């Protein structure tokens, strides 16, 4: 249903933490102009944990309104409360989002049966395409491939963002689910391999700052052209590393500030990128000719 380079969009903020609506609209246009295939808003990179519910919903609406159908908009609507996730997913549907991204419930660490019933309840309650999001390093809870296969039988669960670097797990999901569910990488460093084994794209942090390059890498990888994909991927590796020098989205927001696209705002408990990483990130941006 969705494919290619899907940017995990940051949520621009002013230095005092207020949301920067002009900056958000500017980013949407930047991605449309530079070949991004879809926008994923208010996910991990979009700082959803520190947004108020009304802010969360308004960000979705602003992105949808600015996109004007020029590319798909996927809204992060996951929560560790099933009821809250249903409410956010319904709000995203009403706002005009094309699909929703639902993270595995964090902190309360449900069983596999609890995970199955959680996602099943949301899918049955809200008729919008839904993409599962497994990121065990953040949630302390792992959605196993066997549970993904059960969920793939639900018609509006259409994909999974697998944020691990485990290529064998990606293959297992594809084998268990077949064409019932699309696989997306949630780790930039593993994205190329995920697509070469049959994944449909990546939900990418790096695409925030290098949208053309990530789009080009996805295009050739989806065509099965390993040589061309590896050439771009190898070139991007220093940028992948620099963008995770501190926890995401700290480095990518600083990079976008350096590029002149957003203000230097981030909400506590996250903080602005430590000065010791500034030159590392500048060098990676210069190497990709993003900065002069």
UniProtKB/Swiss-Prot annotation:
GO BP field: diaminopimelate biosynthetic process; lysine biosynthetic process via diaminopimelate
GO MF annotation, one: 4-hydroxy-tetrahydrodipicolinate synthase activity
Chief localisation class: cytoplasm
Record's subcellular location: Cytoplasm
Catalytic activity: L-aspartate 4-semialdehyde + pyruvate = (2S,4S)-4-hydroxy-2,3,4,5-tetrahydrodipicolinate + H2O + H(+)
GO cellular component terms given for this protein: cytosol
Keyword Ligase among record annotations: no
InterPro entries: Aldolase_TIM, DapA, DapA-like, Schiff_base-form_aldolases_AS, Schiff_base-form_aldolases_CS
Binding site for pyruvate: 45, 203
Key words, A-Z: Amino-acid biosynthesis, Cytoplasm, Diaminopimelate biosynthesis, Lyase, Lysine biosynthesis, Schiff base
Disulfide-linked positions: none
Protein family membership: Belongs to the DapA family.
Subunit organization: Homotetramer; dimer of dimers.
Job description of the protein: Catalyzes the condensation of (S)-aspartate-beta-semialdehyde [(S)-ASA] and pyruvate to 4-hydroxy-tetrahydrodipicolinate (HTPA).
HAMAP family tied to this protein: DapA (MF_00418)
Name of protein: 4-hydroxy-tetrahydrodipicolinate synthase
Organism: Nitrosococcus oceani (strain ATCC 19707 / BCRC 17464 / JCM 30415 / NCIMB 11848 / C-107)
Species classification: Bacteria, Pseudomonadati, Pseudomonadota, Gammaproteobacteria, Chromatiales
């Amino acid at each position: 249903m969705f494919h290619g380079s899907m940017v995990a969009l940051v949520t621009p903020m002013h230095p005092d933490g207020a949301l920067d609506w002009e900056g958000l609209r500017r980013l949407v246009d930047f991605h449309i102009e530079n070949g991004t295939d879809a926008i994923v808003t208010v996910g991990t990179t979009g700082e959803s944990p520190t947004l108020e519910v009304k802010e969360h919903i308004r960000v979705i609406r602003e992105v949808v309104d600015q996109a004007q159908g020029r590319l798909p908009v996927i809204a992060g609507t996951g929560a560790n409360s099933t009821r809250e996730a249903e409410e956010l997913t319904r709000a995203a549907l009403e706002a005009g989002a094309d699909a929703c991204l639902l993270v595995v419930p964090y902190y309360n660490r449900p069983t596999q049966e609890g995970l199955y019933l959680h996602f099943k309840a949301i899918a049955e309650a809200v008729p919008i395409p839904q993409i599962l999001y497994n990121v065990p390093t953040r949630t302390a809870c792992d959605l196993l491939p066997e549970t993904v296969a059960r969920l793939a039988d639900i018609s509006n669960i259409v994909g999974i963002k697998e944020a691990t670097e485990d290529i064998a797990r990606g293959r297992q999901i594809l084998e268990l689910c077949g064409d019932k569910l699309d696989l997306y990488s949630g780790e930039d460093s593993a994205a190329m391999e995920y697509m070469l084994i049959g994944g449909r794209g990546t939900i990418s942090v790096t695409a925030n700052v290098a949208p053309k390059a990530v789009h080009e890498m996805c295009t050739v990888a989806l065509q099965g052209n390993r040589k061309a994909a590896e050439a771009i991927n190898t070139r991007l590796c220093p940028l992948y590393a620099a963008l995770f020098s501190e926890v995401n989205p700290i480095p990518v927001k600083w990079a976008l500030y350096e590029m002149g696209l957003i203000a230097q705002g981030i909400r506590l408990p996250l903080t602005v990128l430590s000065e010791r990483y500034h030159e590392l990130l500048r060098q990676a941006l210069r190497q990709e000719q993003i900065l002069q």
